[in-house]
């Protein structure tokens, strides 16, 4: 039997990869390049539309634990991430074009794959074939209308993207290279600000013109991608404890810690492009250029991609889907990725791995399985399928119910999670 996957984002490609390696036939429907969402630019699969960072690799962080679990499950997304990584201190960041090309090339190499470049408008509910909806948070058009009827409506939140600038336009006489606390290999460019420079930047930022968005509601902003202007409006010093915090950074030109620092992170392997860390925004493009050029060292910044805001859509998973992310009524329709309420690149990919695993089992005549609740992946799936009031959720320690003090949890939880996942995989053999 052939499996149909709608969407070749991070979740869709993981579902496909698992099934293709098991020898099953897969047909992927990808609307690009026939149609692009407001935030997608490339024709290739697994496009990263926000940051190019896949977060920390430290096992003292939930994101690091999630990566280790995904490695055990042979994640395509992680395999390509490690092949296309760029320096980013303790974080795993990638050259987004090479990363997307890597994923596409791997999937295209399978003989049992069919790639259909078209926009899907609906799924035939009378079909016996398995379908996976992995259309992501920017699902729209006729398919969104059909999906809304199938699921009883959508939930929403707003997300934003940071600008990217050219390295050649940075004045290194005013900036310095370095990582916080001297840890790392000098992966960030730092633009230091005096108190006067910060206050001017702050005044102009909070008074800058923004793009109006239909049905925009500040209460629906996702906490990890708050626009910088929204953070600023919460208080004059709010940025100093957020994306502009200077802690751990000493300006070699003065020997002192600056009043504020704006950091730039590599966007590509060659280091020709840098994104402005924490500068997600919905300012008008003309205002973005004006505000960015107030930053010391960026007075002549060439902006290669402007920041944008977009509405993210997801379904009410606990009400609509079962514990295996199948539709409760139409058991041949699965959902994967951010459309289910997970938030984050790797969280979406992990969701796809889980769905791919269970579809493979079903096609092999076996029963689907739940992931252990004391794994990061299992806890995440457990949350989105059982939450009383579903809110977008990323990997975090609070998802796993173990009786430990906070510091002890940070030190030891990775051992519990990884052992649980290893035992689970051994059980499946």
Swiss-Prot record:
InterPro entries: FAD/NAD-bd_sf, MnmG-rel, MnmG_N, TrmFO. Its main location: cytoplasm. It is found in: Cytoplasm. Its cofactor is FAD. Keywords: Cytoplasm, FAD, Flavoprotein, Methyltransferase, NAD, NADP, Transferase, tRNA processing. It catalyses: uridine(54) in tRNA + (6R)-5,10-methylene-5,6,7,8-tetrahydrofolate + NADH + H(+) = 5-methyluridine(54) in tRNA + (6S)-5,6,7,8-tetrahydrofolate + NAD(+); uridine(54) in tRNA + (6R)-5,10-methylene-5,6,7,8-tetrahydrofolate + NADPH + H(+) = 5-methyluridine(54) in tRNA + (6S)-5,6,7,8-tetrahydrofolate + NADP(+). GO terms for molecular function: flavin adenine dinucleotide binding; tRNA (uracil(54)-C5)-methyltransferase activity, 5,10-methylenetetrahydrofolate-dependent. The keyword Repressor does not apply. It holds the Pfam family GIDA. Belongs to the MnmG family. TrmFO subfamily. This is Methylenetetrahydrofolate--tRNA-(uracil-5-)-methyltransferase TrmFO.
